[in-house]
Amino acid sequence: MLCCYDGLSAVRLIRAEHDITLMERATGTKSLEAMAVNGEDLEATQIICRVVCDLHKAPLPTGVPDLSETFAPLLSAASHPIFDACVTSARALLSDPAKVALHGDIHHENILESTRGWLAIDPKGRIGPPQYDFANLFLNPHTNTAFVLDPARMRNLANWISKTTGIDEICILHAAHAHAGLSACWNSNDPENQEYPLTAANLLHEILHS
């Protein structure tokens, strides 16, 4: 995926051999996580949006999994009121015909400051609707759960992302709701860690239906 981005708002891949990669360093002093929890959440979100919009300009790569494969665990999850609601949002997300080269794991720690500006690192690579790349912001910064699980902050995020990217707020919220359910599925054998995304999924469901 780094080759696909060719340095546009992403670190440059300098060399790759077998399982070893040499990448451009991004060693700025600012942190998007610190900005978000210290009164600059809007500014941090706008930076993330600009980076992601640049990433989505990349041509669609070959051999990259479709987002539907990522959601297979949720779509096949045992019936549960929360999961059932998240499945509905996942189907709404996956039915969107828009397709871009998704980073697949956008959060505050995966965009770093550099001499070239803010750059994304560690892409997972998927093909799917652009709103999915903003879904993980509704679970992050994960080190401050009280901050993240604030319904007012969730509403603000959807509004800020929509205004910056032009993506419909409801589409953004469906993506976030679906991703929270997926995250809960990934943690199905770890009840302690599952509680966090389940709580987020509940809150996002309430926002979607308010």
Predicted regions and their residues:
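Soluble or luminal CAZymes and related metallo-dependent hydrolases
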Residues: 43-47, 82, 153
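Active-site Asp-x-Gly
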Residues: 114-159, 166, 174, 196-200, ...
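Small/polar glycine-rich anion-binding or flexible loop at a beta-alpha turn
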Residues: 174-181
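An alpha-helical support segment within catalytic cores of ATP-dependent transferases
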Residues: 57-104, 114, 163
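A conserved alpha-helical element in kinase catalytic cores
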Residues: 1-22, 26, 30-55
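ATP/Mg2+ or Mg2+-diphosphate-binding catalytic cores
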Residues: 183-210
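Active-site acidic catalytic loop and adjacent metal/ATP-binding pocket
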Residues: 13, 87-132
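Conserved NTP-binding catalytic cores of kinases and kinase-like/nucleotidyltransferase enzymes
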Residues: 1-16, 114-115, 200, 204-210
